[in-house]
Amino acid sequence: MYEDVPIYVKDFLSYMQNIKNRSKATIHEYYYDLRNALRFLKLYKLDKIKLDKINSEMLNETDIANLDIEFIKSITLQDLYEYLNYLSNNCSDRATTRSRKVAALKSFFNYLTFKQKLLDKNPTVELETPKLSKRLPKYLTLDESLALLHSIDGKFQKRDFCIITLFLNCGLRLSELVSINMQDIKDNVLTVIGKGDKERSIYLNKACQDAIAAYIAVRPKDGLKDRDALFISERGTRIGRRTVEVMVKKYIEEAGLDPKKYSPLKLRHT
């Protein structure tokens, strides 16, 4: 499978499927999006074909299986903008589709730069996502929610997974989440103090119960400056709002989603 793309693309697809646990549908989208982008870039950069001369038939006939990593290293931000310009002018892609293709490129180049260490410079760092209509929904789909959860890793994986699980399932405000104390959870019910100091009770489904149990099992016990707080920062204090905002943005980007579109506020409406 995927024999018509270079080995580093195959490796990326394998990484996204086996390590990041992306769905088969998402892997196929990555494959088609990256294959199309590399075919265009070969025609445009190597074959020196003018933008207005490139058509779908030429793309379909272009062989990229032997493109070496040196070609990838030569790709610039401007080359990628030319590709987006081509999509906008020659394809029927809507902004949402182009946005998905940008996300695929960002994930691919992030992988080559930070995981494989094959690139010294990532040309997608400043690549902007096509602006989406304000009428588009601002909540995550099921696949996007799963992608976000699968992106969580690192030293605080259990804590961060628990935080995002609660955001996705409980409709918590950021202020409510950081204010949760250990004693606020009893018999699978979470009690929070919301706007206007109004107390409300939230039933915790199994996903939340499992995430909380997994986090509490590794939650720091020694040297805490706030023993009541459920979520503890690296310094042993109650986790702050800004820390959560930065953390959520980080995982949104790693999931290939648009951080300008999603935030803790948007997660609570999912």
What are these language model-derived features?
Residues 1-270:
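Conserved catalytic core of the tyrosine transesterase superfamily
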